[in-house]
Amino acid sequence: MSITAQSVYRDTGNFFRNQFMTILLVSLLCAFITVVLGHVFSPSDAQLAQLNDGVPVSGSSGLFDLVQNMSPEQQQILLQASAASTFSGLIGNAILAGGVILIIQLVSAGQRVSALRAIGASAPILPKLFILIFLTTLLVQIGIMLVVVPGIIMAILLAPAPVMLVQDKMGVFASMRSSMRLTWANMRLVAPAVLSWLLAKTLLLLFASSFAALTPEIGAVLANTLSNLISAVLLIYLFRLYMLIRQ
């Protein structure tokens, strides 16, 4: 059977519309979890204020130079802030991926589904999803730091891995290997969707500061919710595509 991107886009749009409220609630809940965890593990406002003390920002030629000019205490605060942001984001993304994929599975099985039921049902696979998303994010970031293009290629090749991990109950590394093979053989169907996702995420990041006009916390929840909705659309597309390829 010939698979066209247009037919998968249409199926994705129909599913997203039919399950919009459930997906929205999952996205909102994951955004709230991300923001709360980030706030809990981040340094205090007083500690963050110390980052500006005695650091010659204007005289620094780059990020590494700026960090080197910091005191050991300031470097520790920066590391804690970065780790808190990364950890909370990974937790939120793992719950989102598990919740959305379980929504698709439950709906496909003809069962009634709610946001809490989907997230609860995904609990057993969340540890593996967390490790998978951590490794994927690490590889993509390393690739982007090198020449950008390798990072984008890794993002494309590993995009279906969460779907394969949950749907076929694979291990972390097995799902990564299978994802690379499947994507390489179907690059024309996977690459445009992932590139569109990356573009949408980038545009959202550019306008994220405007959400802070409300309050920083509410703005962060709204921005994360929109980001999660974008990721949910990609997950639905990849799940549908994977099911068609397997037939």
Swiss-Prot record:
GO cellular-component term (any): plasma membrane
Main localization of the protein described in the UniProt heading: membrane
Keyword Membrane: yes
Keywords: Cell inner membrane, Cell membrane, Membrane, Transmembrane, Transmembrane helix
Subcellular location(s) of the protein: Cell inner membrane
Membrane topology of this protein: Multi-pass membrane protein
Name the UniProt record assigns to this protein: UPF0259 membrane protein YciC
